[in-house]
């Protein structure tokens, strides 16, 4: 089968490698190169780099216009596989592919349709999530489900952890979905009454409010890693938080909210919140290295009693 692959995110790299090993990938659609670093030199993303290493045609249009459509048609693809491309496809584009178009979405659809399912499932404190391969339609993430699996989310898992899991565990579902398509299986219609949605996460929400519960704060910290990274201030320095857990307890109720009350080598850096204790596991002073809580504490032994703001 001649497959056209669309992605702009490293989460899809393993799928691109495996699908290219087993099928004829005739083209890759990805985002334009972006300026990066102090010199603002153009940076090639992982998807483009892998495609070029395999001598696969790479398209990086700003707009999916008529010229792009004609170029894709000239590649004579049969199916399009999409995994975190970042743009909406019009029907004219979807109609190029006679076998159809399928999309990998990292949630248990119809739950968490939209651009940030991995972060949102952590923000909401869910204990399970999943991977869905669906047929593509004009309505976002609403196509028939061809394959789906679920996995457990641990309390201290970050978005980085889930991205890695999804990256390594999506390919088998793609094969299951392809086999169903070729057999004429239309999949399972999503129940729109159970659909929920997620939106883009921005920098404006990354500041930690320690008046919230420890559970909600640790969810925010873990969800916002690797971006936009939750943060607070300590001694007029910005501190970035990368990983956390929590303890549900009424102890320390007499302590000031945001106060670093203790360091426990077996748990982490303990911070008083509006409800419970935040256990900080990884953090960073701006401009310094990311450290585990033990290393951070040993380099800042005067932490106990200080207050985050």
Swiss-Prot record:
Q: In the UniProt record, what gene is named as encoding this protein?
A: fmt
CDD domains per record: FMT_core_Met-tRNA-FMT_N, Met_tRNA_FMT_C
Family named by the database record: Belongs to the Fmt family.
Among the entry's GO cellular component annotations, what is one?
cytosol
UniProt-listed InterPro entries: Fmt (IPR005794), Formyl_trans_C (IPR005793), Formyl_trans_C_sf (IPR037022), Formyl_transf_N (IPR002376), Formyl_transf_N_sf (IPR036477), Formyl_transferase-like_C_sf (IPR011034), Met-tRNA-FMT_C (IPR044135), Met-tRNA-FMT_N (IPR041711)
The name this protein carries in UniProt is Methionyl-tRNA formyltransferase
Where is (6S)-5,6,7,8-tetrahydrofolate annotated to bind? 107-110
Ordered alphabetically, the record's keywords are: Protein biosynthesis, Transferase
Give EC number(s), comma-separated: 2.1.2.9
Reaction equations catalysed = L-methionyl-tRNA(fMet) + (6R)-10-formyltetrahydrofolate = N-formyl-L-methionyl-tRNA(fMet) + (6S)-5,6,7,8-tetrahydrofolate + H(+)
